[in-house]
């Protein structure tokens, strides 16, 4: 399925995997073709997605509008009611995720999108 799957956390994880690190990626994606396509994209870059939680109605999306003449580029986010937005405390098994982790990376937007995610 065509699309660009990303975001700051995915981009950081992919960069670390590209440099040879063992990266386990944690998020929540819906069942169905869109969720599968997102996971396939992450796997293609060598990310371990075994801790990804499945469920919710949709992927969060963002739209990029290129700059034209004197106007800057714009990004519009549509995250409300996405799978990650509706992630609840206890859905991620943090004990397992962090058991062998040397480093944990999380951006500030993660907590802002889903207060219960952490």
Labelled PLM ranges:
Residues 41-43, 49, 68-118:
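Ribokinase/PfkB-type carbohydrate-kinase core domain
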Residues 1-72, 80, 96:
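Substrate-binding N-lobe of the ribokinase-like
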């Amino acid at each position: 399925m065509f699309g660009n799957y990303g975001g700051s956390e995915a981009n950081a994880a992919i960069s670390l995997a590209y440099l040879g690190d063992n990266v386990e990626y944690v998020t929540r994606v819906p069942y169905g073709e869109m969720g599968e396509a997102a996971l396939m994209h992450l796997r293609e870059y060598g990310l371990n997605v075994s801790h990804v939680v499945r469920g919710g109605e949709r992927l969060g999306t963002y739209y990029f509008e290129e700059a034209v003449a004197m106007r800057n580029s714009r990004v519009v986010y549509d995250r409300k009611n996405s799978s990650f937005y509706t992630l609840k405390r206890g859905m991620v098994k943090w004990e397992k995720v962090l058991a062998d982790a040397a480093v944990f990376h999380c951006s500030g937007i993660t907590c802002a999108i889903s207060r219960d995610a952490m």
